[in-house]
Structure formats: structure tokens, C-alpha cells
Amino acid sequence: SAHTSKGQILEKWTPFLTHPEIDEHWTPQDWSFMGNPLDHIVWDWHQDRDLNVETGKIVFLDVKAAKSQLSTKQRRIRDLVKAGRIEWREIRLD
């Protein structure tokens, strides 16, 4: 539908917008588009390693039209993030 197409276009342009939920220091290079189940990951970090560990963060960001709701999967992700249930894993393949 036209609403879906408009939403998909706006999702991709979000890094270039001004909005209260977008920190002013984020640049478009700080954003990675995912699309599904969340729209973006924002890498809010610093080049200095110690400062980064102290104040840097990774932001999961979803773009919604004014009245649309999070999907069940998006709510689950939000709840796990808020509960601190995130871990790092690395897989090395030879």
C-alpha cells in the first residue's frame, strides 16, 4: 500500500532527520539499517576506548508512524534490552 511504501522510504531517511528521539551528535555514518525486526542500530560510541566503555552505547531504534504499534517480536526485543538480557558472542569459522 502507499502507507507501507511511504513508511519504508521514511525508515531509510531517518538518519538525516531532526527529531527529539535522535541525538544531535549522531551522524548518518553512526546508523546501520536492518529493516526487520528493527529498523536501525545506532552506534553511539567514541574513538577513545576507555571513554567508549564508560559512556558509549548501542541504540536499537525502530521508526513508527504516529499510530502504529510495535509488533510482538519488537516488544520482546524491547523488553529483553530493558532487562539487560543482551550478550556478546563471536563465532570464528576456519
Model-predicted segments: where are they?
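Conserved catalytic cores of phosphodiester-cleaving nucleases, focusing on short active-site segments
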Residues: 39-42, 48-67
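Eukaryotic charge-rich
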Residues: 61-64, 71, 75-76, 92-93
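General small-molecule cofactor/ligand-binding pocket signal
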Residues: 87-91
